Amino acid sequence: MTDYDRITANPHFDMLMSAHNHVQSTTQSALVPMVVEQSARGERSFDIFSRLLRERVIFLTGQVEDHMANLIVAQLLFLEAENPDKDIHLYINSPGGSVSAGLAIFDTMNFIKPEVSTICMGGAYSMGSFLLAAGQKGKRYALANARVMIHQPSGGAQGQATDIEINAREILKTRARLNEILAERTGQSVEKIEKDVERDYWLDAKEAKEYGLIDEVLERRPASL
C-alpha cells in the first residue's frame, strides 16, 4: 500500500479534512481550488489545502486563535501518527493573535517526534514570528520579501483593582516567559529581547536571519523542501 492509499484510508482522515475544509471555507474569501485525483479507491476530490496536507504541508494563515490552533494541533498529531520520522512543513503568513493559542501550537511542535520546519511567506508578526522561530533549528526559512515583527504581548483588564493587578502580573509573567523562549530560539540575550520588544520591531528576511529568528532566506525551493 502506498503512502497515498494508507493516509486516505485512515478512518480519521475524512474527519480531519472536514474540519480543515470548514476552517478554510470560513477564513478564505476567495474560492478555494479543488483537485481531483485517481487512486486505487477510485476518484476523490480535495481542496488544495487538504491535498498539500498529504504532502505533510500545513498552512498557518490569518489570526492565531483557539479554533485555528486546535486545527493546527490536530494536523500535527495526525501527521506524527502517520509517520513519526518524516519532517512536517509549516508555512506561516499571520498577523499573530492569542498568546495561549500560539503556545498550544508551540508546545505541540516540541512535543511531537517529527521535526517541524517553518517557512514565512508574506509576513509573520507577533505570535506568527514566535512560531516561525519555534521551528527546528536549521530548518527555519523566510521567502525573500517576507517581513517579520516581534513585540511584547498586549492585554487589558477591567473590574476591581485587585483583578486588574492580578491580570497585570499575569501579563508580565507571560512576557518574561516569551522573552526567555525567544532568547533561546534566536541566540540573543534576554536583555536584548526585552529591549527590542518594547515596541514593534520590524525586520526584513535578511535581518530576521541575522537576528536568529530564521536560518535561511529562500529565493528558490531547496531539495529539503
Curated annotation (Swiss-Prot):
Its EC number is 3.4.21.92. PROSITE patterns: CLP_PROTEASE_HIS (PS00382). The keyword Repeat does not apply. The keyword Cytoplasm applies. It comes from the Bacteria. It catalyses: Hydrolysis of proteins to small peptides in the presence of ATP and magnesium. alpha-casein is the usual test substrate. In the absence of ATP, only oligopeptides shorter than five residues are hydrolyzed (such as succinyl-Leu-Tyr-|-NHMec, and Leu-Tyr-Leu-|-Tyr-Trp, in which cleavage of the -Tyr-|-Leu- and -Tyr-|-Trp bonds also occurs). One of its GO terms (cellular component) is endopeptidase Clp complex. The active site is at residues 126, 151. It is an enzyme of class 3 (hydrolase). Transmembrane segments: none annotated. It is found in: Cytoplasm. Pfam families: CLP_protease (PF00574). One of its GO terms (biological process) is protein quality control for misfolded or incompletely synthesized proteins. Belongs to the peptidase S14 family. Cleaves peptides in various proteins in a process that requires ATP hydrolysis. Has a chymotrypsin-like activity. Plays a major role in the degradation of misfolded proteins. Fourteen ClpP subunits assemble into 2 heptameric rings which stack back to back to give a disk-like structure with a central cavity, resembling the structure of eukaryotic proteasomes. This is ATP-dependent Clp protease proteolytic subunit. It comes from Psychrobacter arcticus (strain DSM 17307 / VKM B-2377 / 273-4).
